[in-house]
């Protein structure tokens, strides 16, 4: 049983397969587990195991996702594969399965297709940092020149979406032949994984990032001062350190004079901890839910941004009718609803559309009525009367 051998002393990286329907994403995922299983680094997952992905719910949105784990000599991987295009859109936008990098699967028999482009754009918009290309079904193309042309086309496509098209590794594979155990194609899967090891950077750990905690509640403790509670999203905060309060009103600085967790006093709080932070010189009226406490200067408040948004279908509890430019919903950001306006939008392929239908994937420009601590890649929900009607990710900050 390979299960016993999984060690947790290797760095952990989250990846996934993306690309056009029927280009072999799931077959390739199965092939990776088949090849690595021979070295005791994975459990064999067959196409049917992966394809029958259970439904998951993330922020009320139903997504089908298969999770596979395996390891190489240097890393441990969690790999996500989605059966349908809509599942990818939802997955990448909600961040249900965060990806540190992705394997773009493109069939040599077809070349890049509509969803190949859409997935590259999505990867760019939601901030997937690195890609590796698996040129699949190469066993079905006899002419080496055709394969070279497809590779060139993919590289140009990647460059057009601001990925380093000339430098991204492109590996010729055949998922099917590798599963069937043909040595030449098994070696190609190993080559692919070596490329993934080498070119998908190791993610920075949450504790190593600059401190950020979204305020969930505020209390006043007589004789001691004001306490803000919440879950530390990233970084570390130590007693005596200066932090900045950002969002809703003008940013201001304060010093953390105490860190409490489960009624015990600590020297520091770190990413993942639910804590109360005692703040010097701050009145209860000065801070509120929706603000964030951060390492000074590490994040700034903004009102205007662009986002990639998935609009829920009626069956998912979304709207029953379309909306138009000028629509004013609430944007739920971290811990609070902020009213805003969707001033403009374009369709998934960048074309202009008059209205947005439930089930659409759009790029939109939003403007909030008050500034909120915002950064690229930040997730948000769009709500109307307390129910979620869309999920989004910030792709550009305007002002």
From Swiss-Prot:
Uppermost EC category: hydrolase
Keywords: Cytoplasm, Elongation factor, GTP-binding, Hydrolase, Magnesium, Metal-binding, Nucleotide-binding, Protein biosynthesis
Domain spans labelled tr-type G: 10-204
Catalysed transformations (reactions): GTP + H2O = GDP + phosphate + H(+)
Stretch list, region G3: 81-84
Region: G4, residue numbers: 136-139
Binding site for GTP: 19-26, 81-85, 136-139
Residue positions binding Mg(2+): 26
GO molecular function, one term: translation elongation factor activity
Region (G2): 60-64
InterPro entries per UniProt: EF-Tu_GTP-bd, EF-Tu_GTPase, EFTu-like_2, EFTU_2, G_TR_CS, P-loop_NTPase, Small_GTP-bd, T_Tr_GTP-bd_dom
Record's GO cellular component terms: cytosol
Superkingdom, taxonomy of origin: Bacteria
Coiled coil residues, start to end: none
E.C. numbers: 3.6.5.3
Region of interest (G1), residue spans: 19-26
Subunit structure: Monomer.
HAMAP family tied to this protein: EF_Tu_B (MF_00118_B)
Family: Belongs to the TRAFAC class translation factor GTPase superfamily. Classic translation factor GTPase family. EF-Tu/EF-1A subfamily.
Function: GTP hydrolase that promotes the GTP-dependent binding of aminoacyl-tRNA to the A-site of ribosomes during protein biosynthesis.
Descriptive protein name: Elongation factor Tu
Biological source species: Synechococcus sp. (strain CC9311)
Gene: tuf
